[in-house]
Amino acid sequence: ADPSAKPVLMDNGFEYIPATIIKSSANTQHNYLIIDKGSEDGVVRNSGVITEKGVIGIVDAVSSHYSYAISFLNTELFISARLGESGAVGPLAWDGMSSDRAILKEIPLQFKFEPGDTVYTSGYSTIFPPDIPIGVAGESKIINGATNEIDVNLFQNHKALKYVTIVANRRAAEIESIEQQEEEQPKK
């Protein structure tokens, strides 16, 4: 992403804001990023941080000119991911050890997949748009006889990052508002 490029608002409601990482950690269980774009640039809390090779993190705090993001290389961060072009969805998280590996959990046993199948963002959150390629499926194991847990080899080298794109969902507040309205409705 060219950090001098202008933000772009897409039809899907996401604004894409080119940015540069100015500080990061990569050697702990709770890694973070400091990014050179803030509220004056259109960044809001819970914006996604991506590259063309995958998910990088989620913005957790914003000042006028900078953002603090929780890195995908953080054991407390889970994202909604989809296996294959039209496959099952489950939580994806860093494995806590290798900067190029993650684990996709809760994939039903009846879902068939092959090592090498691509893992994408699911689009089932207000943070990331759908269909961002994240990595490829590797080995798997069955958990409690009920679901698959799949190793994912990430496309993005998280230790060699400089340029990223912040994705701010301009429709997130509307989506969250309608969810809250439904939750407050008396149940029939």
Please name every model-derived segment:
Residues 2-188:
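A secondary-structure micro-motif
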